[in-house]
Regions:
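A composition-driven surface/loop motif
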Residues: 1-133
Length: 133
């Protein structure tokens, strides 16, 4: 099922899904793995675009590393910094259509047996975007 998500939401969902590690039905584990693959690919694309913005606008030292001051990347001037931050924010707010493998609620209900781990309420909240018909 195609879903439209902001890049920032994709990053958050990726981190949250990576934190789920239970003994669940095969179909649920497969959907988690498949969706992680899709979400990670989008994160990599966004990271590459962020890198491109920083490479164009940030100050680098003689080794090609970004210069930091007070834990922040240094820019040549305030105008360039604002431009870079705006572009980075635009990337983060981009809406991207991703193909999400959904599972029926009945698959999650299978976890209510001794055979599988029962997802916590936090894990259920993370999995919510994957629940379909």
């Amino acid at each position: 099922m195609k879903q439209t998500l902001k890049v920032s939401d994709i990053r958050n969902k990726t981190i949250e899904l990576q934190g789920i590690n239970g003994h669940f039905p095969v179909k649920l584990n497969y959907a988690i793995a498949k969706n992680l693959k899709v979400l990670i690919a989008e994160c990599e694309t966004a990271t590459a675009q962020n890198q491109k913005v920083l490479d164009e606008k940030a100050i680098k030292d003689k080794n090609g590393e970004y210069v930091f001051k007070n834990d922040e990347i240094v820019f040549p001037n305030e105008k360039t910094k604002k431009e870079a931050l705006k572009e980075l924010n635009n990337i983060s707010n981009l809406e991207v259509e991703v193909e999400i493998m959904t599972v029926p609620i009945s698959t999650l209900e299978m976890c209510d047996t001794d055979k599988y781990d029962t997802p916590t309420s936090k894990e259920m909240a993370v999995l919510e975007f994957m629940i379909g018909e």
